[in-house]
């Protein structure tokens, strides 16, 4: 059985950075945006369109885990969303079978639940997330603190809706994770080293 770590994260909490550091420390493959690229290759959709689907709040009334019988009507957006999620599931399962790996986001903790991955959720306080977003923002982005705070909240709300729609589980629920890490004022390099040491012990 391959060793797998999944990372869910709040926007701006440096979950991606932690994932990359862990992959270097453990020698594991790292998957994030690579999943989007692979979905695009296997469908007729562009990467930008696939990205827009996975970053959009589902507009359907019932979560997908309830029953597909609710969606007998023809709805192109629904069909595309389902096609993307099905490809995403297949690709994540293939990646997990191929080698030891770290997968960020994409409902990977749920998709791979039968493989018993180490499930990590990363969070931080709002001030820390604001600082991180400022550091990573394009030079031409001129958001006030209030606007940026709202952007962070909106992105996390979309992530929660997406996760809950496809899994039927609440996003970020600590009971669904093996490790919840607060990255506020923490060195990601040191945190990754500590997690890697704990994981290998």
Kindly label every feature range from the protein language model:
Residues 6-20:
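Glycine-rich phosphate-binding P-loop
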Residues 29-40:
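Short beta-strand-centered segment that lines the nucleotide-binding/catalytic pocket of NTP-utilizing
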Residues 40-100:
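ATP-dependent small-molecule kinase phosphotransfer cores
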Residues 60-65, 142-188:
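Small-molecule kinase domains that catalyze NTP-dependent phosphoryl transfer to phosphate-bearing small molecules
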Residues 89, 188-196:
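Short, amphipathic alpha-helical "lid/cap" segments that border enzyme active or binding sites
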Residues 105-109:
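Short, polar loop motifs at secondary-structure junctions
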Residues 114-135, 143-153:
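Conserved phosphate-donor/acceptor-positioning beta-strand/loop module used by diverse small-molecule
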């Amino acid at each position: 059985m391959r060793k797998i770590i999944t990372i869910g994260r709040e926007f701006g909490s440096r979950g991606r950075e932690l994932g990359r550091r862990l992959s270097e420390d453990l020698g594991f493959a790292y998957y994030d945006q690579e999943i989007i690229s692979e979905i695009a290759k296997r469908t007729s959709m562009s990467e930008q369109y696939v990205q827009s689907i996975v970053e959009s709040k589902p507009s359907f009334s019932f979560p997908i885990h309830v029953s597909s019988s609710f969606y007998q009507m023809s709805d192109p957006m629904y069909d595309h969303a389902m096609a993307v999620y099905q490809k995403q599931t297949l690709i994540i399962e293939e990646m997990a079978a191929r080698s030891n790996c770290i997968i960020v986001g994409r409902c990977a903790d749920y998709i791979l639940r039968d493989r018993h991955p180490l499930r990590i959720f990363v969070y931080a306080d709002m001030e820390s997330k604001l600082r991180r977003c400022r550091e990573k923002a394009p030079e031409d982005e001129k958001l006030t603190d209030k606007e940026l705070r709202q952007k962070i909240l909106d992105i996390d709300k979309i992530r929660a809706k997406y996760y809950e729609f496809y899994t039927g589980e609440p996003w970020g629920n600590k009971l669904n994770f093996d490790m919840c890490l607060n990255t506020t004022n923490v060195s990601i390099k040191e945190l990754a080293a500590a997690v890697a040491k704990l994981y290998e012990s």
